[in-house]
């Protein structure tokens, strides 16, 4: 996810932030995103299939923080896939109407999703 965000930011800067506009980072970003989405999906399936070890009351602890952040990351990841597809298809069609705005939203959601994943991972570790 970290590499996807960094290369995605470089791609955004290249295409919409005053870069050369050659699309130098498009393919690396695409490959990283596919692998990130695949690993995220596999991890989510693994987590959903894990047995519940014991019942415990709902209280604010690292387990709850992890669950809330993981739900946020999942919502963000689904949004990223949809926004990325829409933005890429808009760019491919040559329709520049609202393209930069869609790319900005995609960029912001990507970093927000990264934040949720970081929180979920940190809560899981500690």
Place the predicted regions along the sequence by residue:
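Hydrophobic alpha-helical membrane segments
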Residues: 1-126
């Amino acid at each position: 996810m970290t590499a996807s965000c960094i290369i995605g930011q470089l791609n955004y800067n290249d295409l919409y932030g005053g870069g050369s506009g050659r699309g130098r980072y498009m393919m690396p970003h695409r490959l990283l995103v596919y692998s990130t989405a695949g690993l995220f999906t596999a991890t989510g399936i693994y987590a959903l299939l894990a047995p519940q070890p014991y019942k415990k009351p709902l209280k604010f602890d690292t387990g709850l923080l992890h669950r809330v952040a993981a739900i946020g990351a999942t919502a963000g990841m689904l949004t990223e896939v949809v926004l990325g597809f829409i933005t890429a298809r808009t760019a491919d069609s040559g329709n520049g109407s609202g393209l930069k705005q869609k790319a900005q939203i995609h960029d912001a959601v990507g970093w927000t999703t990264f934040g949720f994943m970081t929180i979920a991972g940190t809560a899981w570790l500690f």
